[in-house]
Regions:
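Extracytoplasmic/periplasmic solute-binding protein
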Residues: 2-56, 99
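Short, solvent-exposed loop/beta-turn-alpha elements that line the ligand-binding surface or hinge
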Residues: 25, 42-66, 114-119, 127-138, ...
Length: 267
């Protein structure tokens, strides 16, 4: 990330009309999506960089504070309204040639390679997520398909999921702009030729980090992003993130978790 900061300064000097960076930074999971790989890269842990093994929040600890300071530093080279940028807005800014570098989920990448939607479709290169002092990690996320307990056709619904997500459909789905998480698809020559970012998805095997996977996560995510935004707007990182961690702890208890039952509260 330090190298990215240095590169952004050079881009701004040579292209003052362009925003060197456009990250998804808004609420609603956008900020944490951009931040999670940085958080792990600065030593906050993996695959869950948000809590310890007993589900005590650790967003106030030194690694996350350092990562938040780095993100605040990078904001010098983001749009003035960077905290309003969601996945689509960041992707559009990049596709229109208004930003030099973006971080986003792979599902958004076909858009920037399509000449009908992107002004830079023939000028795009892809790289792994930037690393931090403690290594380089990839953000892991996705969607879940399920079958309603009220369904009258559960077997047919399951067969549909099997068909849609099956290996035989992977290449066709990817070639039509879909997001496929299959080794066979990521290594398919036709897919790689059209969408050269696919091999980079295999970096997930080198180290990954993700969202929380516990019941009150949606509420906790909103709280975390609220306090990270406060830091991005200039509030003191240490005290602000401590306040956020205290609120997250209460929310975890309301959600049915009692971290103190399985381990001591960290400093």
């Amino acid at each position: 990330y330090e190298e990215l900061y240095e590169a952004a300064a050079k881009i701004k000097a040579n292209h003052p009309e362009m925003d060197p960076l456009a990250f998804p930074m808004a609420m609603g999971g956008n900020f944490l999506s951009s931040f999670m790989a940085m958080n792990s890269g600065y030593g906050a842990g993996t695959p869950d960089s948000w809590t310890d093994g007993n589900l005590f929040p650790k967003m106030h600890q030194a690694p996350t504070v350092a990562a938040a300071k780095m993100m605040k530093k990078l904001m010098e080279y983001m749009p003035a309204d960077a905290l309003d940028y969601d996945f689509d807005k960041a992707n559009t800014a990049f596709a229109q040639g208004n930003a030099a570098f973006t971080v986003n989920w792979n599902a958004y990448m076909p858009y920037v390679l399509d000449p009908d939607s992107s002004a830079v479709s023939d000028k795009v290169a892809f790289c792994a997520t930037p690393g931090g002092p403690e290594g380089r990690y990839s953000a892991l996320g996705g969607w879940v398909q399920g079958i309603s307990s009220q369904s009258e056709n559960k077997d047919a619904a399951f067969q549909l999921i099997q068909y849609i997500s099956g290996k035989d459909r992977g290449v066709d789905f990817a070639m039509n702009g879909g997001s496929v998480a299959r080794f066979s698809t990521a290594n398919d020559s036709a897919v790689v030729e059209k969408y050269p970012f696919y091999p980079l998805l295999m970096d997930i095997l080198k180290g990954y980090t993700g969202f929380g996977v516990y019941r009150p996560w949606p509420e906790i995510e909103k709280t975390m992003e609220t306090y990270f935004h406060k830091v991005m707007l200039g509030e003191d990182p240490e005290s602000t993130l401590l306040q956020g961690a205290q609120q997250v702890y209460v929310q975890a208890q309301r959600g049915g978790y009692n971290p103190g039952a399985t381990g001591p509260k960290p400093n």
